[in-house]
Amino acid sequence: MSEYECVDSVETLTKTLERVKNAQKEFSKYSQEQVDKIFQAAAIAANEARIPLAKMAVEETGMGIVEDKVIKNHYAAEYIYNKYKNEKTCGVIYQDDSYGIKKIAEPVGIVAAVIPTTNPTSTAIFKTLIALKTRNGIIISPHPRAKKSTIEAAKTVLEAAVKAGAPEDIIAWIDVPSLELTNMLMQSADIILATGGPGMVKSAYSSGKPALGVGAGNTPAVIDESANVILAVNSIIHSKTFDNGMICASEQSVIVSDKIYDKVKDEFVKRGCYILNPEETEKVRKTIIINGALNAKIVGQKAHTIAELAGVSVPENTKILIGEVESVDLSEEFAHEKLSPVLAMYKSSSFDDALEKAYRLIEDGGLGHTSSLYVNTVTEKEKIEKFYSKMKTCRVLVNTPSSQGGIGDLYNFKLTPSLTLGCGTWGGNSVSENVGIKHLLNIKTVAERRENMLWFRAPEKVYMKRGCLPVALEELKNVMNKKRVFIVTDTFLYENGYTKVVTDKLDEMGIVHETFFNVAPDPTLACAKEGVKLIDAFKPDCIIAIGGGSAMDAAKIMWVLYEHPEVDFLDMAMRFMDIRKRVYTFPKMGEKAYFIAVPTSAGTGSEVTPFAVITDETTGQKYPLADYELLPKMAIVDADMMMNAPKGLTSASGIDALVHSIEAYVSMMATEFTDGLAIEAIKTIFEYLPRAYEEGANDPHAREKMANAATMAGMAFANAFLGICHSMGHKLGAYHHLAHGVTVGLVLDEVMRFNAEEVPTKMGTFPQYEYPHALRRYAEIADSLNLGGNTDQEKLERLINKIDELKERVGFKKTIKDYGISEEDFLSTLDEMSEKAFDDQCTGANPRYPLISEIKEIYLKTYYGGEI
């Protein structure tokens, strides 16, 4: 190794920092194999030196027990090595190609390690080993009273590491520690690994550099009346006498149930502890704390030595001095951290009293560190829960000696082994766990673009063809064995016999039924609740919705209220960005009743969609619900139910189906599964809507084609979703009472031009949507209709012209103004409509993400016709 220069000044520390930085730069290029070889060699060397290092520490500091320090050194070498020997800390440490995620470990750089006088060699071993495992350089600032042993431990690790291939200057230390050099080191390092008292920890956190610091412990041990007294007392003795109580997690007080207090005292005495009488307790009080601070002369000393200092005579082999005290506030010297075999003993009148005492002891002197409970873990689980809920400590140990238990991997093998125990924000720390290698690594996450898992959801059964309704209903008896059917429809359909084909078939099969026919357009919550009263009394095992969108929406809501009367519509109507990641989980449907939808108009597609809209009649608020639990279990598309639809309904619902298809095709969430349905529906609507509108029941073929087109469009948008045509249409209809099909048809032209912009203000956000291509998608629709055109823009305009021709042919007017909406009324609602349209659930899947001002502009163009 190169000639060593004593670090005793700012100048020499500056040089050392530079050398360690250069060494770390080289070390950061090492492979995992090289690092693991160095890590093992260093751990072996530290383990082999455990006895001489322990002797040196006790000799130098005059504190602790050699044999226990041997165990600590052994632990720091063996347990730390065992914990991390197979951990990846170099380069790629995790990779999942299916999710496109790769995690890469990088060292943080230079670690400033502040070492306490209480555990000098073991802490130095621990910190140098985890620094080597993570390819960091480390510079140690030892405590002045333990510098010789601390440096020897670091030197032992360094020599073994270099021999195994590590850079020569990867570990260094301050030979002549001072406050000035320690502060300089902390300010110059990349991270501070601090172990010590509150003052040192505060200094570390004030350095301006990231710090991993711990602080004082004041561990209370509560002994519940259900505890195994022999186990509890001997565990506490084992912990408190370990290295003469210098582990920061060691018990500082015991709080004992009054029901077993004498028994616990007897066990302590039996095992060699000394219960101080009141006079002796007072003498020891004055020895523990001097001038408001812990007396350094008692730290790590034997109980007999401390008793002598206090002028108390005890047997030489006394293990612990126990003072019976009552106060838990700071005026009581025994209530402080003592770092010696001196213990406070409190009597508790109840478990809650014990909790309060323990809480106060932690609050005043050991926030965040460790607390301990002895209890019957089988019968007193509630007490354990109360204890960990009350204690503000990051380690809550149960039936465990806290010194050995707190450092981890000895009494619980999932608690990380460490000699630096985080105290969380309660203790003013940045970590709340046992510090380990992960805290000395920067983890880069490489995230490759991945596309969402998509889906195609539809009712489990969809039946179609004219006259299929009674045939499909036979399944209720022959397949499902249903007994009671509740029918939901509107007054017009009921009075005009639309439900008769269903009720006749149910009567034929001997199935009991009841009909609710008070559904109005834009169904209300009151309407749904009225229906649910009947449903609750009737208790159906099947619900059949017959009608257009309103009847099916109302029936879906009744279905929800019947199966889950506890639901909150505000929660169910909550907006989502991804239906699979929504905050609100929709309740499971279909457990009480099977749901069948029978459409009587060709437009909404509700028979195959997971959507419903309900209005709160008291506020006028519409609640749009969307969840695949609302998907009907069966859809029966029988064109015979649509033959006599009036022209206005045929027109509005037909254009609604067209908009469903177009929006589903250009949606960011469109897939090959929805594209085919959308295109087929578009072609069918252009061909057959005029015939259905003009000929009605005289052209049953056109009626059937439109029925199928509406359902295909429904399947398409049930999976690809919609866009701002529907966002704007919903609000226009709500504010100005126009039919839904009319409103979406009115805004369609301007929305298409808006979406087709190749340089949008903002494009939509979805991984499958790689770049703005709505124009291309509109052109593909035009191509499917053989509209011609040489460019995509030309094809778009031809498609819009074709749509306008269709709308005119089926009786549509051209502008909002043409429908009798006054300019004053329209403009007075414009801002509110625009904002609410922006917040509509349909906006999220639109290929162009709109600004509210852009929605407003589209509304204005649609009102006046063209440019504004």
Where do the model's predicted regions map?
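Glycine/threonine-rich beta-strand-loop-alpha-helix active-site module
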Residues: 153, 526-640
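ALDH superfamily catalytic-core signature
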Residues: 7-9, 125, 201-329
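Conserved C-terminal structural/oligomerization subdomain of aldehyde/semialdehyde dehydrogenase
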Residues: 312-313, 317-452
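Rossmann-like NAD(P) dinucleotide-binding subdomain of oxidoreductase/dehydrogenase enzymes
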Residues: 92-231
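ATP/NTP phosphate-donor binding region
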Residues: 454-542, 816-817
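Carboxylate- and glycine-rich phosphate/diphosphate-binding segment that chelates Mg2+/Mn2+
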Residues: 270, 608-720
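Gly/Pro-rich interdomain helix-loop hinge
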Residues: 738, 742-825, 868
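N-terminal Rossmann-like NAD(P)+-binding subdomain of aldehyde/semialdehyde dehydrogenases
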Residues: 1-102, 270
